[in-house]
Structure formats: structure tokens, C-alpha cells
A protein has these predicted regions:
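Conserved N-terminal Rossmann-fold NAD(P)-binding element of oxidoreductases
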Residues: 11
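Minor-groove-contacting beta-hairpin "wing" of winged helix-turn-helix DNA-binding domains
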Residues: 353-357
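Short, well-structured beta-strand/strand-turn elements
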Residues: 234-240, 336, 345-347
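A short, conserved structural fragment
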Residues: 342-352
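Short amphipathic alpha-helical interaction segments
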Residues: 329-343
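Short, amphipathic alpha-helical interaction segments positioned at domain boundaries
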Residues: 359-373
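Local cysteine-cluster metal-coordination motifs and their immediate loop/turn environment
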Residues: 14-25
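C-terminal scaffold of the Radical SAM
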Residues: 4-8, 27-48, 54-329
Length: 373
């Protein structure tokens, strides 16, 4: 997979019309705060314009970046370009919701320089969309998808969700069938995760909602991988599939490859030179700090060599590129662990790399514990 000459830039746009009942990301439903957020983002840029020289990926995530009025998107983009340098082939991604897409929005994003779209479809089943409290319908999702294709976007990705209570393999396959019928360049498939402090979390605590059990969730995962690979998609990261190497998400690969990246906005994370820092989560507190001329950083950590080692394993085993076998050299007991993982068909060896199987993807988050001192 790709190695990176430049860091990536992420901007968190924390605005939503309504809060989805499963979402634990930082977001607010008051759009009246957009001007304050935009001014704060401009101020935050000043802290980093000499620290990061050039980017080759720009990702607007949320929240719902497509909610921003065109003039505010243009203003944000102008200031980013004024303060930072970008490579000529920069990947510029914007997350969008189908119900926010007017007939003019695709062309406006294209003219701004956006060259990659991540469309939050979640399902091609209207009943499932209602359960998820999504504001769009299947017809709106199809219309948005057609709009971006008609506007000339060569890279459109779909976000889908499985593991909903009552969902069957056949209903999930129907969503996958419909998704692939549009030939999107990228598909992300996430299992519904019920977080404690969300409305779904409250329902689970009250016994009114039962998430998928682990065995069924694993079956859905394998089904997804097999289906999409048969359709010609590379299963290049646990939740992500691309139609060829050229359609991998460059920006997100930076996270998994431990490349440097800068995050602007409330709750955004950054990483550079072995240090990681993260911003204040609350929008009002974030804006106030910047209005007072202070960096909005909530915390910072410098990784120890052992943390770097374990994080490299954790992130590497999330991707089909795996982990360079060299990092295990002179680590007592690792050869035996690797042999056990191979016998269990969780990993295999490709050249000088240890690569997870689909079965290995299922337990990737727990594998670093085996290598901890």
C-alpha cells in the first residue's frame, strides 16, 4: 500500500440537523454556531502554519460538512489554502448526507476542488433507515449518488451499516447488491456499535434493544468481505473496500500507517513526531479558547517505544498490508506467537510481512495484547 511523503489535514465540522441515536461523535444541532466555529477554525490554523509544511490529503468530516452553506465552505477552503501548502494531487474528501444535497451542491463542491465524496447512505432499506432515524430515504440516496456521478466525480464512496437488530443476512445482501450496482469506487461497512451515552445505549440499558451477538456479527462480517471481494473490491482495511489500489482512501490510510496528520476543530486529533494531541470536545469551550488566543488542546501524549511498537501492530493488523516482520526481531517469544497465529489461520506471511486473514480481522483489536511485555 501507499507510503506518504506528506501529512494529512482533517477538519471537524460538528453540525447536524438532528443527532443520530447511535452517534457518539462530537456534534451539535444548532446551525447558528457555524460563524463562531468558522472564525475559531481560522484562528486555530495560525498555530500550525509553520509546523506543517505541505499536505496531500484534506478531509472534511463531522458532523455533516455538507450542511455548511457554499459561501462558508468556500471561505474555509480559501483560508486553508492561504495558510497551508497542498500537493498538486491532493485528495480532497467531503462527507455528505443524501438529504442535504441540492441539485447545485455537487457542482459547487466540484468547483471548490473536492475530488472525493463520502456519502452516508447507511442502508438501501427504508425501514432500516427509519430505525436509524436517518432523515433521507432510499430514493434520496440514489438521487444524491446520481448527482455526484453526473457532476463528474470519479471517486464516490458509500458508508453502509450492518448489525441492526432484526436485520437478516438476506436484507443486508440486498443493500450490498444495490450499493455495488452503482459501481462506487469505495465502500465502508461498519457494524452498528451501541455506545453507552447515546439514545440507543439508553434503550439497551433498559432492555428495549438487543445488539447483535458476537457470532452473528462475525458471520455478517465474513459475508460482507466475501461478497464485495467477489464483486472486485479490495478488502484493504477492516471496514473498508476499494475498487482497485487507486481508490484507497489516502487520508484514512495515514491513520493506519501512523503517518503525520493535523486535526482542526473540536475533538480533532493530531499526530506528529511521536506525539499525539487532541482538542477540546465542547464546541463552545473550543471557540472560547481560540477567542482568547489560546490553543484549544485538551491533552497531549508522547508515545514510548513500547507504545509505538504495540500501536504499529494494532494498526497494521487492521489492514491487508499487515505488519513488517522486522519489528518482531529480537523480541523474545514473538516467533512462537506468530506461529500460533498462523496455525490458527489468523495471519499468513507475504514476503517480509505478517498479514491478517479475514478471520484475523475479526480479532485484530486484541492481537497486540499477545505481544505486550
Amino acid at each position: 500500500m501507499t507510503e506518504f511523503a506528506h501529512p494529512g489535514l482533517y477538519v471537524h465540522v460538528p453540525f447536524c440537523k438532528t443527532k443520530c441515536p447511535y452517534c457518539d461523535f462530537t456534534s451539535v444541532t444548532s446551525l447558528s454556531s457555524i460563524p463562531d466555529w468558522l472564525e475559531a477554525i481560522k484562528k486555530e490554523m495560525l498555530f500550525y502554519r509553520d509546523r506543517f509544511s505541505r499536505f496531500d490529503s484534506l478531509y472534511l468530516g463531522g458532523g455533516t460538512p455538507s450542511l455548511l452553506p457554499d459561501r462558508d465552505l468556500a471561505d474555509l477552503h480559501h483560508h486553508l489554502r492561504s495558510h497551508f501548502l497542498f500537493a498538486g494531487d491532493t485528495e480532497f474528501t467531503v462527507e455528505v448526507n443524501p438529504d442535504d444535497i441540492s441539485s447545485s451542491k455537487p457542482a459547487a463542491l466540484r468547483d471548490l476542488g473536492v475530488n472525493r465524496i463520502s456519502l452516508g447512505v447507511q442502508s438501501f432499506d427504508d425501514q432500516e433507515l427509519r430505525f436509524l432515524k436517518r432523515r433521507h430515504t432510499v430514493d434520496q440516496a440514489v438521487k444524491a449518488l446520481d448527482g455526484f456521478k453526473d457532476a463528474g466525480f470519479a471517486k464516490v464512496g458509500l458508508d453502509l451499516m450492518y448489525g441492526l437488530p432484526g436485520q437478516t443476512e438476506s436484507s443486508w445482501l440486498k443493500t450490498l447488491e444495490q450499493a455495488t450496482s452503482f459501481n462506487p469506487e469505495h465502500i465502508s461497512c461498519y457494524q452498528l456499535t451501541v455506545e453507552e451515552h447515546t439514545p440507543f445505549g439508553v434503550l439497551r440499558a433498559q432492555g428495549e434493544m438487543k445488539p447483535l451477538d458476537e457470532e452473528t456479527g462475525s458471520a455478517f462480517f465474513v459475508l460482507t468481505s466475501v461478497f464485495l471481494e467477489e464483486k472486485g473490491y479490495l478488502h484493504y482495511e477492516i471496514s473498508n473496500f476499494a475498487r482497485g489500489e487507486e481508490n484507497l482512501c489516502r487520508h484514512n490510510l495515514k491513520y493506519w500507517k501512523r503517518a503525520p496528520y493535523l486535526g482542526l476543530g473540536p475533538s480533532a486529533h493530531s499526530y506528529q513526531g511521536g506525539s499525539r494531541w487532541w482538542n477540546l470536545r465542547d464546541l463552545e469551550t473550543y471557540c472560547r479558547a481560540l477567542a482568547e488566543g489560546k490553543p484549544p488542546v485538551a491533552g497531549l501524549e508522547t508515545l514510548t517505544p513500547e507504545q509505538v511498537y504495540l500501536e504499529t501492530i494494532l494498526l497494521g493488523f487492521r489492514t491487508r498490508d499487515g505488519v513488517d516482520r522486522e519489528i518482531f526481531r529480537n523480541r523474545p517469544g514473538t516467533e512462537e506467537i506468530l506461529r500460533h497465529l498462523q496455525q490458527a489461520r489468523l495471519v499468513h506471511h507475504v514476503g517480509g510481512r505478517v498479514v491478517p486473514t479475514v478471520k484475523g480481522f475479526l480479532v485484530a483489536d486484541s492481537l497486540p495484547l499477545l505481544f505486550a511485555n
